[in-house]
């Protein structure tokens, strides 16, 4: 059961993840965790763990304290760096989010986990052994502690040489502000 974000970096866990050198988005996620807001979430999630699980992670957290200070991170930066170190040292590198999704939706993928773009589940073709219902999004479960994903802001621009700027603005509004446009 993954009810805390530290479970994903626990002993023997090898989450499926698109290798950090495949696309910058994976690195951005890890960098983002060092922001005070997310580092505090990691600390709070750590504090919610049972004592035996805390004891497993504590040496890595302690090891990262001087590194966090050297990098000028906030008071909880050592929790972020520890989580990142454990994640990078344990994930099962994949080439893309598509194969990760295809693995996790099979009924044989019990006790596997991964971090991937959520919209990959939209393209799953349901069958006897394949279903999005085989996946539980940890962050959506009652009682989950810690980080649970992230999203990027959409930046859609209209250039100053656009022949139809109001049409472009209307299209952007449709894509970002309506259910039909967003799901397209």
Predicted regions, residues:
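A conserved helix-loop-strand patch within extracytoplasmic ligand-binding domains
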Residues: 1-17
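Extracytoplasmic/periplasmic substrate-recognition and gating elements
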Residues: 99, 110-112, 128-183
């Amino acid at each position: 059961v993954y009810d805390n974000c530290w479970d994903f970096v626990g002993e023997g866990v090898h989450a499926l993840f698109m290798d950090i050198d495949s696309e910058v988005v994976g690195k951005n996620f890890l960098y983002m965790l060092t922001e005070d807001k997310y580092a505090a979430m990691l600390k709070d999630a750590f504090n919610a763990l049972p004592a035996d699980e805390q004891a497993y992670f504590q040496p890595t957290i302690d090891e990262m304290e001087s590194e966090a200070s050297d990098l000028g991170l906030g008071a909880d930066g050592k929790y972020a760096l520890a989580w990142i170190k454990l994640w990078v040292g344990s994930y099962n590198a994949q080439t893309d989010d598509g194969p990760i999704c295809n693995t996790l939706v099979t009924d044989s993928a019990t006790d596997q986990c991964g971090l991937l773009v959520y919209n990959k589940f939209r393209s799953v073709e349901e069958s006897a052994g394949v279903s999005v219902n085989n996946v539980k999004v940890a962050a959506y479960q009652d009682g989950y502690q810690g980080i649970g994903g992230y999203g990027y802001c959409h930046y859609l621009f209209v250039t100053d040489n656009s022949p139809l700027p109001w049409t472009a603005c209307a299209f952007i509004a449709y894509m970002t502000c309506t259910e039909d446009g967003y799901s397209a």
